[in-house]
């Protein structure tokens, strides 16, 4: 099975390229732009795509790939910065544009007798595309031709032609991977299926079959342990490994007392029909004891992480392997051209287990994006209610009770959050938002209930829309809905007399408050 290799030059859209390719049914991988030719050969790519990027190809710190890629005989498509890399490599020129293009633009496709000159634009009319560039090609490389133009970019799309046509090298100034490019997926499909001749043979089913075989080979007769939370990633990972090795997998669910209302019972009920062997550990007392009087969010996260490790360590006996629900965006972040980004928050993850345990990692989902994890889950027969659950932070409600954590404050938050989620589901809004939750603030406000003055807690509601959690906009929920939720919480939850709605987007805010 041939894959498509995406060379990452630092574009914010690089992950989108890989996702769009997989939607076409072809497996894709992202590697840094400076990956050596030998490593690229090892991937045996059926096509290579050069991503966009923030640099200028004529700058001193410009990024350039190994020039050997142009001699591999593999079709190459350059996007934005990738186009400019191609243009300069083959002798063309790139310069700063007098008029930058950011946002929608219309392209005109070059035609002959009514048909596009390039196979790349088969079945694609003049249409809107998404631009994001300050530089443009100002001199065409010899042996190339223009296949599309825009009002500001005469060489908006180019390709090798004539004696160089056999190179199958193409360049686009716009971004076909972005949804605002109306025929972007069609263009990528033309490149991959018609020009590169690849077969769309990647699917959740083929992925599962490959992983089961690989897990069995890796594990042999050894036993495996998996920390499970009832969330999408850990559940899908556990079920996939269980399909491969059955009773050799032991799952541990640590109830840290920081879960949503009745969450422990719900998780065990969810996991039972999936055929998993799960050991429930009630650790509420030790977690709350160690968190007492701790207000700093970073300290809370570290205490929770250390405590989890301590408890999880007690559950490990003869196991040689640990299952972890790492996803592809985590892998990309660790190897991208930008390198690991600055730590905004410490991540609570079983991956922090001490090295002395000498557990080998099994990461069956490390090649998948979140939407693909859900698709694999469906193929495995996991219930839709589990697969479409909203993300929940590893440290649980400890980072939604701002300030110090106590059982009393946790219970107040649980009751309020249950009302919010219950109303979202009853109004068919739950699946229209990426994530929704409540936050108990470390402030109190004056209120009046009946004839009495109150001085009680303030609660914030948070709901966001997103496709991947990398960026998010606040959800524009109906005013009548918010009014009903607020009234219910204030009347039904003791200890809250004021409700606010968070209308911050990410960035600059993060989705979670801590």
UniProtKB/Swiss-Prot annotation:
It comes from the Bacteria. One of its GO terms (cellular component) is cytosol. ATP binds at residues 229-235. It is an enzyme of class 6 (ligase). Residues 3-201 form the Glutamine amidotransferase type-1 domain. The keyword Ribonucleoprotein does not apply. Its EC number is 6.3.5.2. GO terms for molecular function: ATP binding; GMP synthase activity. Residues 202-389 form the GMPS ATP-PPase domain. The keyword Nucleotide-binding applies. It holds the Pfam family NAD_synthase. The active site is at residues 80, 175, 177. It catalyses: XMP + L-glutamine + ATP + H2O = GMP + L-glutamate + AMP + diphosphate + 2 H(+). Signal peptide: none annotated. Keywords: ATP-binding, Glutamine amidotransferase, GMP biosynthesis, Ligase, Nucleotide-binding, Purine biosynthesis. Pathway: Purine metabolism; GMP biosynthesis; GMP from XMP (L-Gln route): step 1/1. Homodimer. Catalyzes the synthesis of GMP from XMP. This is GMP synthase [glutamine-hydrolyzing]. It comes from Chlorobium phaeobacteroides (strain BS1). The lineage of its organism: Bacteria, Pseudomonadati, Chlorobiota, Chlorobiia, Chlorobiales.
């Amino acid at each position: 099975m041939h894959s498509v290799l995406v060379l990452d030059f630092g574009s914010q859209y690089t992950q989108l390229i890989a996702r769009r390719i997989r939607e076409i049914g072809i497996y894709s991988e992202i590697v840094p732009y400076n990956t050596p030719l030998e490593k690229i050969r090892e991937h045996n790519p059926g096509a290579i795509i050069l991503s966009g990027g923030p640099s200028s190809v004529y700058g001193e710190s410009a990024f350039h790939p190994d020039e050997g890629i142009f001699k591999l005989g593999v079709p190459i498509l350059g996007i934005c910065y990738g186009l400019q890399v191609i243009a300069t490599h083959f002798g063309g020129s790139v310069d700063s544009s007098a008029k930058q293009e950011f946002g929608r633009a219309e392209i005109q496709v070059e035609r002959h007798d009514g048909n596009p000159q390039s196979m790349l634009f088969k079945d694609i009319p003049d249409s809107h595309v998404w631009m994001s560039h300050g530089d443009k090609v100002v001199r065409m490389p010899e042996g190339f031709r223009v296949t599309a133009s825009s009002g500001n970019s005469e060489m908006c799309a180019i390709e090798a032609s004539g004696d160089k046509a056999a190179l199958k090298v193409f360049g686009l100034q716009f971004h076909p991977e972005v949804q605002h490019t109306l025929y972007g997926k069609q263009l990528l499909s033309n490149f991959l299926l018609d020009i590169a001749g690849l077969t769309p043979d990647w699917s959740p089913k083929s992925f599962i079959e490959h992983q089961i075989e690989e897990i069995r080979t890796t594990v042999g007769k050894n036993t495996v342990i998996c920390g499970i939370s009832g969330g999408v990633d850990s559940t899908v990972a556990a079920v996939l490994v269980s399909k491969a090795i059955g009773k050799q997998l032991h799952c541990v669910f640590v109830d840290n007392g920081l879960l949503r209302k009745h969450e422990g019972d719900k998780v065990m009920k969810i996991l039972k029909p999936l055929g998993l062997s799960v050991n429930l550990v009630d650790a509420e007392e030790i977690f709350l004891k160690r968190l007492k009087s701790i207000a700093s969010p970073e300290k809370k996260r570290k205490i929770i992480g250390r405590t989890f490790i301590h408890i999880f360590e007690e559950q490990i006996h003869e196991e040689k392997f640990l299952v972890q629900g790492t996803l592809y965006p985590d892998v990309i972040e660790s190897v991208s051209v930008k390198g690991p980004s600055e730590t905004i928050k410490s991540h609570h993850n079983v991956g922090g287990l001490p090295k002395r345990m000498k557990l080998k990692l099994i990461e069956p989902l490390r090649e998948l994006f979140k939407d693909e994890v859900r698709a694999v889950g469906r193929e495995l027969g996991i219930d839709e209610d589990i697969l479409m659950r909203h993300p929940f932070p590893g440290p649980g409600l400890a980072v939604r009770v701002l300030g110090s954590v106590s059982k009393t404050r946790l219970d107040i938050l649980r009751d309020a959050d249950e009302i919010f989620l219950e109303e979202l589901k009853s109004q068919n809004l739950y699946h229209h938002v990426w994530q929704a939750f409540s936050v108990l603030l470390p402030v109190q406000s004056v209120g009046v209930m009946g004839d009495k003055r109150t001085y009680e807690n303030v609660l914030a509601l948070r709901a966001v829309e997103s496709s991947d959690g990398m960026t998010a906009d606040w959800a524009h929920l109906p005013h009548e809905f918010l009014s009903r939720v607020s009234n219910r919480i204030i009347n039904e939850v003791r200890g809250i007399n004021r409700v606010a709605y968070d209308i911050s987007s990410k960035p600059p805010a993060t989705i979670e408050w801590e």
